[in-house]
Amino acid sequence: EVRVDLTQARVVPYSGQTRNIGELKRFACLACRGDVLVEVDHDDELTPDCVAELAAAFADPRVDFAYSNCCEINDGKPWRYDEKYGWRYRPFAWDGQQQWECVAFDPSPASFSKIWFAPNHVRAWRANFYRRIGGHDPSRAVLDDQDILSRTYIHGRVKHIDRCLYVYHVHAGNTCRGEQNSFIQ
């Protein structure tokens, strides 16, 4: 069982103005005081066993970065990418409805360097490793995750947790649908 002392919980507001997601993620991660940094989008959900699974993964001192499978829900409906590109799926129940668990690709230079196949979420770094590789690039308005995942793979020891630990909600406000998506593609 993993417990968090809520007296240690804190929110550090970002006082600047920026359009660079890399700057915001770097600020948030460097403000954290824990040993493991877990990336969670404000509009997504962690599964109830997520924190315990991450704690088990990072109990191995050799692990610098861990990532899991995820479930993508597109405007409230189950979502799947075309399996002809190598995507694999398993049934996954969430919030009383049948969804699909997207099985993340195994760690490799190809999967970590191409944003289409890179680990989605949950993603977690050992804090000292995150700092050692320079964290998120504050100059990045998009593709900050492709950049940091490439550096993570090159310099770190990676663990894929073969369980769905993250529910990703795709909607009109995501960058995967917004004006920046054409640049990302």
Predicted regions and their residues:
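Conserved donor NDP-sugar-binding/catalytic core segment of glycosyltransferases
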Residues: 51-92
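A recurrent flexible, glycine/aromatic-enriched loop bordering the glycosyltransferase active site
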Residues: 22, 90-124
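Catalytic beta-strand/loop signature of glycosyltransferases that borders the donor
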Residues: 69, 159-165
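Acidic donor-binding segment of Leloir-type glycosyltransferases
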Residues: 1-15
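The conserved acidic donor/metal-binding loop of glycosyltransferases
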Residues: 41-45, 69
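Short aromatic/hydrophobic "clamp" motif used to bind/position activated sugar donors
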Residues: 37
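Acidic donor-binding loop at a coil-to-helix junction in glycosyltransferase catalytic cores
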Residues: 141-148
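Glycine-rich, basic loop-to-helix element that forms the pyrophosphate-binding segment
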Residues: 14-32
